[in-house]
Amino acid sequence: MLNKEQLQTIIKLQAELDLKIVQTKMIEESQDVLTAKFLALLVEIGEFANEQRCFKYWSSKPASSKAVLLEEYIDGLHFIISIANNLKLNLSDLKIVEQKYDNLNLAFLDLFSETLALAKEKNLSIINQWFNIYYTIAKLCDFSGDDIFNGYLDKNKINHLRQEQNY
């Protein structure tokens, strides 16, 4: 998983991107923006699951490439870090513990559940459990901490460019 330095860098970069979006789009931070971020996170988790294809029992087509899966994983990471920044939750205090799952379907279902719980309760203990699950999914997908960190840096650059191009 990410080391503390990598996580702190991501938190800082996400705060800078969020500020740029607010300024570029002239958005007033409000509960509506936070609600939109939670919905966006759920959508990104769904897109990740869709590319993973673990739930598609009717299909013999394999999961998308590791690069595609990592990109979807990173999209979810962008939103959860943005949400944590919004809520002023100190992610440096996270205690990540790998979870045990018989299959990815159960992990994704738990991740959806924790996302909805976080949208209601907005506390560090729920976000810690969210990260436990997300970390476990990363391991099951064979993503290293460096894969995640470098993937985040690449996507962050793309997101800044998109803002500059009036995305």
Task: Describe the function of each predicted region.
Residues 1-167:
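Flexible "arm" and connector segments at domain edges
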